Amino acid sequence: MKIPSSEMEWKMIARDFGEKYQFWNCLGALDGKHVAIQKPRLSGSLYYNYKGYFSIVLMALANARKEFIMIDVGANGRVSDGGVLFYTKFWELYQQRSLFLPQPGTLPSTSDIFPFVFIGDEAFALGENLMKPYPQYACNNEQKTFNYRLSRARSVVECAFGILRTKFGVFQKNINFEPSKAALIVATSCYLHNYLIKTSRKQYLTSSWKVETQSSEQLLDLEPTNNRNPSRDAKMIRQKFCHYFNNEGKLL
C-alpha cells in the first residue's frame, strides 16, 4: 500500500473523515495490535509482551473507508507499546517532514485555522499532529465530548482490525512461524483486506465482524502510555479542537 504523497491525496482522506464522522482535518486513524506468534528460537524474552505471551506488533493507519493506508509490522512485542510508532517508516517520514501533509486550514462554520492531524488512543503520545483522548479520570463535559468525537472517528481502524480478525483465519490462533514470516503473513492479509474492500466492498463488509475469535490473544490493544509531557502547542491544539466540537462544530 502507498502512503499518500501529495497534499491533495491527504485532503481527500480528510474530506471523508469530515463528511462521514464530522472530524474535520483528520488524516487517518492510528492504532496498533499485538499479533500472537510462537516463541522464536533463541530469542529469550525479546518478543514477550506485557500480556504474558509472544507477539509481534502491527501498527496501522486507516482511512474513513476502513482501508489501511499505512502498515508497519514486525516490531517485537516487548518494545514499549507507545514507542512502537517511533520505529516505523511512517514516523521517520513524519520527522523528516517528507509526508507532504497539508498546510493548516479552516473548519466548517469558523474562520479559525486548525492543523491537519492523525488520531490515536491512549497508547500514543499527544503531539501537534497527533490527537489522543483526554484522560478519562479527569474529564469535564467538554472534554468528554471531544473524546466521543475522536473515538467515533477512530472506530474505523478498530473496525478494520475487527474485520481482519474475523475474515482471516490466521488471526484466530497463534501464528506458528518465525517473526519475519509471521510479519509477511500479516502484511499480506492487510493488502488482501484493502483489495477486497475495493473490489467486493458490500459482500466483504456485509457480514458481521463482531464475532469472538477462538483466541483471546490475537490482535490485542497496545498498552496505554504514561503522560509524556506533551508540548504546550500540542495541548493548545487539542483544546482548540475541543472548543470547536462544543461550539461551532457541535453535532445537532
Named regions from a protein language model:
Residues M1-L252:
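Short, polybasic Lys/Arg-rich linear motifs in disordered N-terminal/cytosolic regions
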